Amino acid sequence: MPDYMYLLESRLSPEQRAVLERVQELSRSQDVNIYLSGGAVRDLISGQPIRDLDFTVEGNPVRMVRELEKGGARTLWESEKLRHHEVIFAGDVDGSISGARDDVYEKPGAKPEIRFSGIMEDLRRRDFSINAIAISLNTQSRGLLLDPTNGLADLEKQEVRALTNHAFTNQPIRLMRILRYCARMNFRMESRTQEWFDLAIERELHKNLGGADVGNEVRSLAREDNPVATLKQWESHDMLAAIHPNLPRRKPDYDSLNKLARVRGNLMESGLRPRLNVPVMYYTLGRLKDREASAAMRNMELRASEIKEVDELVGHAQKIVQDLKGRKTNAPKDAYFYLASVLPEMLAFIEVEMPNPKAVSKIRSYLQKWRPLRLGLPVGELDALGVPRGTKFDKIIEELFELQLRGRGRDPESRVKILRNLAGIKEEPKKKPEKEKKRKGKEAGTPEVKHEKSKGETPATTSPAAAAKSAPASEKVASAAAGASATKAKGKSAKAGAAAKRARPAAKPKGRAAKSGRR
């Protein structure tokens, strides 16, 4: 069996891992059982990007949510009736926390009676098997996979399977949702589910869609890598009218949505995570008239703050473009800090909707040059120089960053030199190579003769050899030259004597040999 906790830790971002650890700590301190469930587990197993973390608690999660809010989490929407909380966790992580429940229908299509339950009942009441999987985060069963409807097998077969034949009758919004899953994951409907889907379309259940459910589905488009694929699926099944009756005729702005998806990819490569809810809503409704778009947002029960953001999107973007064109952002430092204060989704919208050359050039410099410089500031190098952390430390880093924006201090050698200057640390003197001592009193090419005085030797008892050693240098040179000449002459004399000896005739024999010869 796969180690799902290891899989989680390796697939989650650092921010998501921090949320996971914090939620587990709170569940232990509050003595409640908690599970990672739904889309996070589905995406984990299928290899899709993990967009959000959905947690299910056996009990009421409100205490846990309040503790998370103290640590920086923000609640976007909550329902006491459903015990459901849509949250942006600390670290800008999307997710939700909900209490385990069961939905009981008296008859198909009726409003369900909500009963709070355990995790297994909660998984069985869900829409599709691929969403009915959970991983235990509890101490004694940590990493245990819960899959009561065999959703893992459907993930392997790349199929979306409804859990009951009344799935679309009970909640017609699932017609839009299943098309979104198929478009996102490139899955097909399981054969019986396809039959139930076709029957629901034949009964025109899709024409009764509306309200907050449709609003939630349109919001979900902003999390899709390719929202156009989902919108075209909805269009082919005559579901765009659920957003507004005139949308099938006018159609969403597909070209701008495709550009927006590409720009989002560039922003994410730069380490930014844009929330495209407002731009995606704007382009989905963009070809409707203003009053039609406003009516559509009201019918989808969008929050007043969301409607205001969509209405003011263009004006806000125009102001940013004017600032980027003006003197306010002429200097690279000023442009950097200005753009760092702008929401990433606004940068994406400007690149798509208002491609002013000067503004776009600064945005791209921010993403591709300035921001990487900022993230790579040499804090460790300044630590190594012995500068203590504090106001002075931060000031030096900021001054270095400003110089780097101007093109200075980008290579290691010059960067260290600048850091030393800014910190007031003198450079270490360079070590000079050792040089040979000059030979005193010696001509070039002559061997050095060292004088070593014998221990205990006095001038009165100096031997001739010692006296010669103590003679002046000029006398030594002359003596050495004379000795060399004498040696050379002696050698020549010896050679001449040997030659003469070879040339001399043999001597006459003496004694009896001589007398006998005379006879």
Predicted regions and their residues:
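Catalytic cores of the polymerase beta-like nucleotidyltransferase superfamily
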Residues: 1-519
